[in-house]
Regions:
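Hydrophobic packing positions in regular secondary-structure scaffolds
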Residues: 1-179
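A short, hydrophobic C-terminal helix/tail in secreted or cell-surface proteins
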Residues: 180-185
Length: 185
């Protein structure tokens, strides 16, 4: 109810500062009319991402994933990664892992950020990545995602589409936040 008290322009500015999973969460609890008005006023790229997220089943990875993540070609070295992180406008505010992808954008490994930042520039990503990453499908249910995070103590997991291409990520922080809202006190 308090959300509906804000002017649309103010609400759009506030939401634009959030991660896509948080924007989706806020909009799904809004009245339909307000949701449409806010969506219409979001930047076009963000509008597209949120509309897509809202098409996924409410209980699926697609609904709770963040679409801001860092993917890097598996052929890169640490120097290329650092240069990319410094210059790219597409780097999320918070991330814990680099997702190494092949030429088809399929995740083939992960590198925790703290590991990557301690390596010399010439070290190849393929030499330090963990292969066979724990992958979440866009249609996986929340309970399956929870099992994966609990079982493997993940800090983040890549989310893939039906073709296996990387389209998002779920972080342990998002997963924990989600669990807190589902658990009765």
């Amino acid at each position: 109810d308090i959300i509906e008290e804000f002017e649309i322009s103010h609400l759009v500015r506030m939401l634009s500062e959030l991660d896509t999973d948080d924007i989706t969460y806020v909009l799904e609890i809004c009245e339909e009319e307000l949701r449409k008005e806010v969506l219409k006023n979001l930047p076009k790229e963000l509008q597209k991402l949120i509309k897509k997220a809202l098409t996924y089943d409410e209980d699926s990875a697609g609904r709770i994933m963040q679409t801001d993540y860092v993917s890097i070609p598996v052929s890169w070295n640490i120097g290329q990664v650092v240069d990319y992180l410094r210059t790219s406008k597409r780097v999320p505010d918070e991330f814990y892992a680099l997702f190494a992808v092949d030429s088809r954008h399929i995740p083939v490994g992960t590198v925790p950020l703290h590991v990557a930042m301690r390596k010399k520039r010439e070290v190849k990503i393929s030499d330090i990545m963990t292969t066979n990453p724990k992958i979440v499908s866009v249609n996986d249910k929340r309970e399956d995602i929870g099992f994966l995070f609990d079982q493997y103590e993940l800090t983040s997991a890549p989310v893939v589409d039906a073709r296996g291409r990387l389209i998002g990520m779920i972080t342990a922080v998002s997963y924990t936040h989600l669990r807190a809202h589902e658990t009765p006190i």
